């Protein structure tokens, strides 16, 4: 168990270094720091692009801390995957730091479905198992880039592009990813298109996808 724990910590350190690189200078999508830190003041009613700062004298070590990435997420769902997010909502000290982390667990044949991060580049590394990953570039080419990742492999999903990860192995898989924003956002393509509230008209979707409306209605019913 000690060896497994040490290995996990080493892998976590690698991802942390990648996260720092990802958030450095102009590469980060968030504004640069103007002070040492700006811990979120959760009691403030001020609304800004980001979050207001807590008084520095009230900041404690716990504002920069999160525990739980060693714990596997529950993958008993339709997609067979689970994302554990560590961004500014979990660590208020990440405010203005331009970086966050996620742990993604995958059951065999588990999928993190096609989605985008509108405010961040993502750099995942596989901790256990193997993953088939890919992203699609913008119009008009819509070219698909794919790769099979094994333990220790790293890949890059450029900011804003649709991407996915699929566990193509027979065992559980785990990945840890750094993102270049304190609040990357996520838009899951299927949920956005077929599960919006209120729903997008089936006439519009039928024309967009060049299928009958009854097919659109059946798909929307799944969301």
From Swiss-Prot:
It comes from the Eukaryota. Mn(2+) binds at residues 115, 117, 122, 163. CDD domains: cupin_OxOx. One of its GO terms (molecular function) is manganese ion binding. Belongs to the germin family. May play a role in plant defense. Probably has no oxalate oxidase activity even if the active site is conserved. This is Putative germin-like protein 2-2. The lineage of its organism: Eukaryota, Viridiplantae, Streptophyta, Embryophyta, Tracheophyta.
């Amino acid at each position: 168990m000690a060896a497994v724990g040490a290995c996990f910590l080493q892998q976590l350190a690698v991802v942390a270094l990648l996260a720092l690189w990802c958030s450095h200078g102009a590469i980060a999508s968030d504004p640069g720091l103007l002070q040492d830190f700006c811990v979120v003041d959760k009691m403030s009613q001020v609304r800004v692009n980001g979050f207001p700062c807590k008084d520095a004298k009230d900041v404690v070590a716990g504002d920069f801390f999160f525990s739980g990435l060693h714990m596997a997420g529950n993958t008993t769902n339709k997609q067979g995957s689970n994302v554990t997010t560590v961004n500014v909502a979990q660590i208020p000290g990440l405010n203005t730091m331009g970086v966050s982390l996620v742990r993604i667990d995958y059951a065999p044949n588990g999928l993190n479905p096609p989605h985008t991060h509108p405010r961040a580049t993502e750099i995942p590394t596989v901790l256990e198992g193997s993953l088939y990953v890919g992203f699609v570039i913008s119009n008009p080419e819509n070219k698909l880039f794919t790769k099979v990742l094994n333990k220790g492999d790293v890949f890059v999903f450029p900011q804003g592009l649709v991407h996915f990860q699929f566990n193509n192995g027979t065992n559980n898989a785990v990945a840890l990813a750094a993102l270049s924003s304190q609040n990357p956002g996520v838009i899951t393509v299927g949920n956005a298109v077929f599960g919006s509230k209120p729903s997008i008209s089936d006439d519009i979707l039928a024309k967009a996808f060049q299928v009958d409306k009854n097919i659109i209605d059946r798909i929307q019913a799944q969301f």
